[in-house]
């Protein structure tokens, strides 16, 4: 099929926050996205697979200060330094087509234009923010949304925040977002829909604080330099700026947007299924076709997170068990929409049972038969049968993959 004739398929991971090295949970999401991208290429699609890093925010600024370096130096080391994120994805054979960093000049330029446009159309206005803020999650919360006085997402401490800020009229789009979630398959799996509607939309969406003045590491609001753009506004639009929206770096926006699916962890479904479509509605832009909120990898029933320090290093696992074995384990073991209990014991058990025993025995028996019947050498000339022709046809065409769909694959 000619390149211009191919259907397009645009798939993304979330862009990861480089406050520390990534853990096996991030690898899980990226490997799953990679598997889907490879699968769609087998079907003959023109695939755009995007991943990257979300590099602004108060947490990065605080981490850099504690390390005695600039924020840019801090994220450069995590992203592009030895055994950084770029090295990890290379090690794990991730086939992404692009990698975006929110500190890239073209992205910063685009975000300033986007923020200004929403301001000029009346959906961003100036006010004063008073409420709770979770620095690890870079999230604003009302008192009623807290869980036992702590962040409902990560369980961490929140602090009072009071500062001049710009706000996005999120409340204006509550009805349209609710309709999107409840009448379409935009958000998957369906279990996530009730959570978003019951916990966030129906209690009443408040306008979203979209700028900060209490720190400086972010995209400056070009018409009010004392403000930097809220990190989630900066981050979410990466899916469009990486295609050239409002910049001249790339020219693929009309070709690939809207995205076919965003794969994201369930802890950021709220941003992708409520805030993201609302801002796109404000901009008059098409919405992504699907957001898929996958589950967490947990250890002994507890969530794995950088802030808790209870993470598993994918480099260690890949070096010990091999990249292909680790990829197989992540894709084989955990239902994608549900949480999964990770343990070294389960990893070893899966490798032994599925690879060493089943696949290993097949290879062992095949090589033994080659040795016994052909003297250890396969004949260079052989007679093909009808069964051989059928097998060749099956493995050389993507048609056999077309019965699989996103829900069955995930």
Language-model regions, residue ranges each:
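N-terminal, positively charged nucleic-acid-binding surface of large information/translation enzymes
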Residues: 2-186
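Structured secondary-structure scaffolds
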Residues: 2-51, 106-110, 160-372, 379
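Acidic, turn-prone loop/beta-hairpin segments
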Residues: 54, 374-400
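Short, glycine/acidic-enriched loop or turn micro-motifs at the edges of active sites
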Residues: 57, 237, 408
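Structural signal for well-ordered, non-membrane alpha-helices
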Residues: 83-89, 115, 119, 206, ...
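Short linear capping/connector segments at secondary-structure termini
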Residues: 95-101, 343-346, 378-384
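A glycine-rich phosphate-binding loop feature that marks nucleotide/adenosyl-phosphate handling sites
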Residues: 132-136, 295-297, 346, 382-386
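Conserved small/polar residues in nucleotide/adenosyl-binding loops
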Residues: 402-410
